[in-house]
């Protein structure tokens, strides 16, 4: 490598050349070019200055950098050296690193170069730092110039402890530890660690170090509550436990009770903690109420106080005038008022527990809503309202009867006339005629029956609370203080008494109605036999007509007399003659409620009425027979013989004659005339207006000619008047013909 001497020699040679003849001189450009070639050929190793007018070898650069560091007092920033030497910072930094690696007398730190002579300055810094620490006891490193390299100071340079960014003296830490000990000894209650730490003035790390040092020395008179890292961590001194135990023990011995709120404040809200203070045996003797612990002796005193108050107290003076002596002394006491003399901090729940204990231990005693009272008050109160209960029972029985009648007596809506030819079908003459006039839908398709919400039995009646309260207030047998309580207590008993009274009244009514029921069943049975006889008679009459008229008449017979007979049999089965008033749904529900031996035959009976088969009448007779057997209704309905039918025919003729004589409606008069003439001819039947034209056609053989002609004329006139209701002339002609027909038939 080129030495500095070689450079100097080269410089001398160049200078001599420059001093020679001008022809041999080198320009500045030539000089730079020569140097560049020398550097490129690695003949020389130099570094240019920033302005390019000066160059220096790297070895000489190291010397100049060292000189600059020593000249600066042993410490020089690299930036300052670069400015002083007018060389790029990169060359300065690279050369400084070479110096540090090859020379132990120099150190590079944080872009600053330090010389060995700088140690004298470090000693001065140590003295300065010790002085600061001694005066301020602690200060943050950021307040010091970090260029002092305080981290490299040895423990012999100054007496202190570095904790993060803070330096503490040993004397300061010892003093803070003594302060912590004094605070821990002085505390008498549970205190948060954060409060103690703030009072001592240490960081969390130094605080716990001091705390652990005291613990190791046995100088911590207490325990920690919770985790050290938790903000809720607290210190519980032993003195606090002693004071709590003394306080609770003395309070319990003096008062014989302990408030749970006080125990919770003292940290004794658990049974285990309380046992540690009083002892497990003593805690077992305590009576646990809602907000207080008390001794069994104090509990007995409370019970005896209330019992004595209940025995000695008289009722409110407003009632003494009205209440009998045995009620005045029967016993009533308010828990709160009775226990005021004991001056106990009881809440409502505690008073209720005491009242319940009294009610459970003392015979014939009740407790409710803060009052203790004797059962005799309830007994006398219930007796005092017997009159009101009896009156209400009669009212309820009447309501039940009315509702039963409504449910069973709901009439189906009026039947609309089926067609214009079905006229005059309200009265048909005779037993069968009247029944036939009801039409084929009498027992059938009604609408949905309404369901009533009114009670239908004694099990649903009850006494309202407002009503009971009014009765008791009127009787003046219950003090106003416990009136609400007595109403709640007696509500069920009063309702039971009312239902019992209703049952007794209903039982009496059943006894009274029993005889009437037998008579009613007998009448219904006679009605069934009479209807079945009429049915057989009319059925025999329909056999004289050719089909399809005969078949139509038999179907009509089923829809009229057959339906009436079925309803009568069902009425006999249930014992109430009101089935004809029921709608179809109600009737079906009534059938379903019957016993199976009765239900099935009656169900088949009503089913046969809806049949349109040729053997519908035979099915009807079979069903009637099944309904009348002993296992069902015991009606014993039988088909009548020819003689019986003749007797029924005579009765039918007589009834038709009476109706015809009193009838004035043309259409009905015509129908009755036709039925009467057939009955007189030994062919009794029942029909509606739509059969009149066909029946008249069958009368030509046995009816006089003039009568037959009148029948035809009247039939045409009736149809004309129905179709033309405003034709007064036709009505007048019809009226004349009807009168002639009526006279001719009844003569």
Curated annotation (Swiss-Prot):
One of its GO terms (molecular function) is UFM1 transferase activity. Residues 450-465 have a biased composition (Polar residues). InterPro entries: Ufl1, Ufl1-like_C, Ufl1_dom, Ufl1_N. Its EC number is 2.3.2.-. It is an enzyme of class 2 (transferase). Coiled coil: none annotated. Residues 429-438 have a biased composition (Basic residues). Pfam families: E3_UFM1_ligase, UFL1, UFL1_C. Transmembrane segments: none annotated. Keywords: Transferase, Ubl conjugation pathway. One of its GO terms (biological process) is reticulophagy. Residues 403-468 are annotated as: Disordered. The keyword Transferase applies. GO terms for cellular component: endoplasmic reticulum membrane. Residues 439-449 have a biased composition (Gly residues). E3 UFM1-protein ligase that mediates ufmylation of target proteins. Belongs to the UFL1 family. PANTHER family: E3 UFM1-PROTEIN LIGASE 1. This is E3 UFM1-protein ligase 1 homolog. It comes from Caenorhabditis briggsae. The gene is ufl-1.
């Amino acid at each position: 490598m080129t030495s500095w001497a070689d450079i100097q020699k080269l410089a001398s040679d160049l200078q001599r050349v420059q001093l020679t003849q001008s022809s041999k001189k080198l320009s500045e450009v030539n000089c730079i070019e020569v140097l560049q070639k020398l550097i490129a050929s690695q003949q020389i190793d130099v570094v240019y200055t920033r302005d390019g007018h000066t160059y220096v070898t790297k070895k000489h650069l190291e010397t100049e950098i060292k000189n600059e560091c020593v000249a600066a007092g042993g410490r020089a920033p690299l930036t300052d050296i670069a400015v002083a030497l007018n060389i790029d910072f990169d060359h300065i930094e690279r050369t400084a690193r070479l110096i540090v690696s090859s020379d132990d007398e120099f150190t590079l730190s944080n872009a600053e170069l330090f010389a060995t002579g700088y140690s004298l300055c470090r000693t001065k810094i140590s003295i300065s730092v010790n002085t600061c620490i001694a005066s301020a006891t602690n200060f943050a490193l950021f307040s010091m110039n970090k260029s002092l390299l305080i981290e490299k100071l040895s423990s012999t340079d100054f007496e202190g402890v570095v904790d993060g960014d803070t330096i503490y003296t040993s004397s300061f830490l010892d003093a803070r530890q003594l302060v912590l000990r004094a605070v821990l000894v002085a505390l008498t209650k549970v205190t948060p660690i954060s409060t103690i730490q703030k009072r001592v003035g240490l960081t969390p790390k130094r605080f716990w170090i001091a705390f652990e040092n005291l613990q190791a020395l046995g100088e911590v008179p207490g325990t920690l509550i919770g985790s050290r890292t938790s903000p809720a961590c607290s210190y519980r001194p032993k003195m606090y436990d002693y004071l709590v135990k003394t306080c609770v023990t003395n309070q319990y011995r003096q008062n014989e009770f302990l408030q749970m709120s006080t125990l919770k404040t003292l940290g004794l809200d658990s049974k285990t903690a309380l046992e540690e203070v009083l002892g497990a045996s003593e805690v077992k003797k305590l009576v646990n109420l809602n907000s207080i612990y008390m001794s069994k002796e104090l509990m007995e005193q409370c019970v005896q106080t209330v019992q004595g108050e209940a025995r000695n107290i008289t009722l409110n003076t407003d009632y003494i005038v009205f209440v009998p002596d045995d009620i005045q002394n029967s016993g009533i006491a308010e828990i709160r008022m009775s226990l005021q003399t004991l001056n106990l901090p009881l809440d409502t729940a505690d008073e209720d527990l005491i009242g319940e204990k009294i009610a459970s231990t003392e015979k014939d005693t009740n407790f409710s809503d803060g009052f203790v009272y004797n059962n005799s008050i309830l007994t006398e109160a219930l007796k005092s309202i017997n009159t009101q209960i009896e009156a209400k029972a009669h009212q309820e029985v009447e309501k039940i009867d009315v509702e039963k009648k409504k449910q069973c007596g709901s009439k189906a809506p009026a039947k609309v006339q089926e067609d214009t030819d079905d006229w005059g079908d309200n009265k048909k003459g005779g037993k069968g005629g009247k029944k036939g006039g009801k039409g084929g839908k009498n027992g059938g398709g009604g609408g949905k029956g309404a369901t009533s919400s009114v009670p239908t039995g004694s099990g649903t009646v009850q006494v309202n609370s407002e009503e009971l309260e009014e009765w008791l207030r009127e009787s003046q047998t219950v003090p106003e203080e416990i009136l609400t309580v007595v109403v709640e207590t007696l509500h069920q008993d009063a309702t039971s008494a009312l239902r019992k009274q209703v049952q007794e009244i209903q039982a009496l009514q059943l006894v009274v109605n029993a005889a009437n029921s037998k008579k009613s069943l007998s009448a219904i049975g006679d009605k069934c036999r009479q209807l079945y006889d009429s049915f057989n008679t009319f059925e025999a009459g329909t056999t004289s007509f050719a089909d399809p008229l005969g078949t139509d008449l038999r179907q009509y017979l089923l829809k009229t007399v057959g339906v009436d007979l079925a309803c009568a049999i069902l009425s006999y089965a249930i014992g109430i003659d009101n089935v004809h008033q029921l709608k179809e749904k109600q009737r079906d529900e009534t059938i379903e409620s019957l016993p199976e031996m009765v239900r099935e035959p009656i169900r088949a009976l009503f089913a046969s009425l809806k049949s349109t088969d040729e053997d519908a009448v035979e099915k009807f007779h079979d069903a009637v027979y099944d309904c009348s057997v002993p296992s069902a209704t015991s009606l014993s309905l039988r088909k009548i013989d020819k003689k019986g039918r003749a007797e029924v025919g005579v009765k039918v003729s007589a009834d038709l004659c009476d109706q015809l004589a009193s009838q004035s409606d043309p259409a009905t008069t015509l129908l009755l005339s036709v039925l009467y003439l057939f009955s007189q001819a030994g062919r009794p039947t029942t029909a509606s207006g739509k059969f009149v034209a066909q029946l008249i056609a069958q009368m030509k053989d046995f009816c006089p000619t003039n009568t037959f002609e009148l029948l035809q004329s009247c039939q045409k006139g009736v149809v004309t008047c129905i179709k033309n209701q405003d034709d007064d002339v036709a009505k007048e002609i019809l009226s004349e013909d009807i009168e002639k027909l009526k006279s001719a038939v009844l003569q």
